[in-house]
C-alpha cells in the first residue's frame, strides 16, 4: 500500500510544478497550518499541492451545486484534502469481507413493533469519543469496539473505551484479519469470544501500526458471549436493531472523494455501490428536512464530517451497502 503512495509521488512531482496555481498559495499555507501538515521533501509537497488543488476544485463545484439544491450534503477541505481516494482506500479503508461468506442470521425481527422516528445513542451515553485510525486500515477494529462499548454501557452503566489495538495485534490470521491491512467485525467479535475478553484502550492504547499481541487479562474491560448478524440489505431490520439493541457495526462503500471530503448534510452518492470497503458504526437514525438518514460514527477523527460523524441516506436501496453486512455483539 505504501509503495503505491511512493510511486504516485515520484511520477507526479514534475507535473505538479507545472500545474500549481499561484493564486492559491495563501490558502494552501492556511490549510497546511490548520491541519499541521508538514512534508519531508519539496517534491512531496508539490504533489500534495496538486492533489489538494484538484480536491479543492471538486469541493467548490459540488458546493456550488449544493447551493442550487442539487445535493443534500456539502463538502469541505478537511485533513484528508491532500490525498486521493485511492490513497484513502489503501491506507484507511481495508475491510475484508470473508471470501467464503456464510452468514448465520440469528436476529429475530418483530415487524409489528412500533419504533421511534429517530434514535441517537450518543444522547444515552453509549458512544465513546471519535477516534482517529491514522494510516492504518483498522476501521474494522474501531467499528467492532464501538459496538461492544455500547453493550458494555447498557449492561454495566459504565462507558469505557476498548482497545482497537488489541484487535489489530491479536485478532489476526486465525480469524482472517490482517491488522493494519484490514479485517472484519464479526471475526473481531469471535476473537473476543475465544479470548474471553478485550483490554481497555487505556491499558492497551492505539499505535496505528501492527505489533506483537500484548493482551493482558488483568486489564480486561469487556467480554463478548456471542454476536448477531442481520439479513442482507434489510434496512427495516437494521432500523429495528439500532432502535432496540444499540449501535450496529456495518460496512460501507467509502471509495468516493465525496465521502472522505464530506462535511455535513445527508450523504447520497449516485456512484456508490454495495461493495463495502470501510467499517463504521451506525449509532442512530433520523430525518433531516425530509431526508431520512443513518447516523454513522467514523474513525477518521473530529475533522471529518460532522465532528467525526456522517449522516448517510436511509431507505435508498441499501445505499453504499450500509445494510449489507450488519452485526452487533452481546455480552
Curated annotation (Swiss-Prot):
GO terms for cellular component: collagen-containing extracellular matrix; endolysosome lumen; extracellular region; extracellular space; ficolin-1-rich granule lumen; intracellular membrane-bounded organelle; late endosome; lysosomal lumen. Transmembrane segments: none annotated. InterPro entries: Papain-like_cys_pep_sf (IPR038765), Pept_asp_AS (IPR025661), Pept_cys_AS (IPR000169), Pept_his_AS (IPR025660), Peptidase_C1A (IPR013128), Peptidase_C1A_C (IPR000668), Peptidase_C1A_papain-like (IPR039417), Prot_inhib_I29 (IPR013201). Its EC number is 3.4.22.27. Pfam families: Inhibitor_I29, Peptidase_C1. It is found in: Lysosome; Secreted; Cytoplasmic vesicle, Phagosome. It catalyses: Similar to cathepsin L, but with much less activity on Z-Phe-Arg-|-NHMec, and more activity on the Z-Val-Val-Arg-|-Xaa compound. Disulfide bonds join 126-224, 136-180, 170-213, 272-320. It comes from the Eukaryota. Keywords: Cytoplasmic vesicle, Disulfide bond, Glycoprotein, Hydrolase, Lysosome, Protease, Secreted, Signal, Thiol protease, Zymogen. The active site is at 139, 278, 298. One of its GO terms (biological process) is response to acidic pH. Glycans are attached at residue 104. Monomer. This is Cathepsin S. It comes from Homo sapiens (Human).
